[in-house]
């Protein structure tokens, strides 16, 4: 399952991120979540699992796997209903928040930074 990973507080020019900064999508080993997480950590950042309720794999399994790989947190509060005006989705967000909290992971809110236009995100 391919997932989005949000990197926070990292050094953009760090050599461990070079493969991700050349404009093309990463392939092979560099595409693996474990490799992405390690590169972010090497660059001094935090690795966050973005919107764990949007994948074909259940969020509980994804969060558990991310924790095992060393992720620092997950995006708990997200607009899964993709409303015209951003609003979190109570039932799924509360369940994700509990799961992250029980694992001692950081919880984030909002968006995993897909560009400048956040309308509807």
Language-model features and meaning:
Residues 10, 52-53, 79-81, 112-116:
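Active-site beta-loop-alpha junctions enriched in small/polar residues
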Residues 104-120:
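Short acidic/histidine-rich active-site segments
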Residues 35-38, 61-64, 94-98, 102, ...:
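Alpha-helical scaffolding segments of alpha/beta enzyme cores, especially the outer helices
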Residues 1-4, 57-66, 83-95, 116-121:
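Histidine/acidic-residue-rich catalytic or RNA/ligand-binding cores of hydrolases
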Residues 1-69:
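Extended substrate/RNA-proximal surfaces in nucleic-acid metabolism proteins
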Residues 48-51, 74-77, 106-111:
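Active-site neighborhood of phospho(di)ester-bond hydrolases with catalytic His/Asp-centered motifs
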Residues 68-71, 102:
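Alpha-helix termination/capping residues and helix-transition junctions
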Residues 71-85:
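His/Asp/Glu-enriched short active-site or ligand-binding loop at hydrolase and phosphoryl-transfer sites
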């Amino acid at each position: 399952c391919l997932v989005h990973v949000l990197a926070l507080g990292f050094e953009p020019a760090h050599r461990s991120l070079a493969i991700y900064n050349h404009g093309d999508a990463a392939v092979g080993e560099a595409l693996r979540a474990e490799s992405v997480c390690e590169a972010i950590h090497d660059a001094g950042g935090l690795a966050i699992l973005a919107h764990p309720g949007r994948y074909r794999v259940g969020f509980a399994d994804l969060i558990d796997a991310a924790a095992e790989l060393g992720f620092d947190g997950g995006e708990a509060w997200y607009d899964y209903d993709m409303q015209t005006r951003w609003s979190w989705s109570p039932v799924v967000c509360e369940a994700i928040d509990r799961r992250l909290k029980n694992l001692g992971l950081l919880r984030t809110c909002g968006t995993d930074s897909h560009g400048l236009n956040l309308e509807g995100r």
